[in-house]
Amino acid sequence: MTIVRIDAEARWSDVVIHNNTLYYTGVPENLDADAFEQTANTLAQIDAVLEKQGSNKSSILDATIFLADKNDFAAMNKAWDAWVVAGHAPVRCTVQAGLMNPKYKVEIKIVAAV
């Protein structure tokens, strides 16, 4: 059994790959942005991670989106809808959660085929 851990630190790895399946969680870089921009930024990070591993967003199997404020649901969906590949939407769950950094409006966890 081979598990590849990319940029592993003491508490987490940036990316884990096992059995041609990639696991990744992204958080926004611009903490002063609104929910739409934070979501778009996080989705762009997901694109970059997938591309680096020879995959793309149409190969995402599952996405869990954590929102700090449920009132940001429409803004997050606007960014998501502009990004997701028509006909290739993954299973998706959106949860309101108290995120660890109070400036995070969104955090996105994905599982993708690689």
From Swiss-Prot:
Cellular-component GO terms for this entry: cytosol
Single GO biological process annotation from the record: single-species biofilm formation
Cited Gene3D superfamilies: RutC-like (3.30.1330.40)
PROSITE patterns associated with the record: UPF0076 (PS01094)
Superkingdom as given in the UniProt entry: Bacteria
Family under the similarity heading: Belongs to the RutC family.
Protein name stated in the entry: RutC family protein YoaB
Species in which this protein is naturally found: Escherichia coli (strain K12)
Gene encoding the protein: yoaB
